[in-house]
């Protein structure tokens, strides 16, 4: 079983076409491969502050040697913080991406103590003009956010090598030829349009199968 711990972007792994409740309320968990645990709003940059709730969650699970812990964070950083902070701090956004990712991976390394393989889910392509997001702060154009997402995922994949975390993402599969997001992958929920729809699940499952994480 792959235990998916994350912000609202963990909801897709429930197998249900709707947002899931926050843990400890249970998600729908309709798929045989995943269990989804939404811990509420969180950023990759400040994930260390969520250690108490994440540890409580993990300690509540009956983990076996066949299980995985997967972490799903980073979209909020890309959409709401990195471009904004680049301007505020007058620093290249690429520099902030590296700083954010390094902090994220460092915070995840704490959970190696459970001796369960760790999977890191790379942030998805950002919301697009095809399906406008009106639910909260967002900076930059779709293409700008996707370029940052690409840099974030590239850096994240590299940073996962040393701690031996499995990295997996469908970011590239979500892009149109011009680098914008194919909105068909995104949800149709009122005020959202920035989470994955269950329409993306075949692509997700193929990625996990190719990585040998599911059969």
Regions found by a protein language model. Name each.
Residues 113-118:
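A short helix->loop->beta-strand "cap" motif at the edges of active sites that frequently abuts
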Residues 2-5, 9-103:
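Conserved SGNH/GDSL esterase-like catalytic core that processes O-acyl groups on lipids
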Residues 88-99, 140-148, 192, 196:
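Alpha-helix N-cap and loop-to-helix initiation/capping positions
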Residues 11-14, 77-82, 126-132, 174-179:
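Short catalytic/ligand-binding loop motif for oxyanion handling, primarily in non-cytosolic enzymes
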Residues 128-170, 194:
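Substrate-gating cap/lid alpha-helix
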Residues 79-93, 128-140, 184-187:
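Surface-exposed, active-site-proximal loop segments in enzymatic domains
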Residues 148-149, 157, 166, 182-215:
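Histidine-centered active-site loop/cap adjacent to the catalytic His
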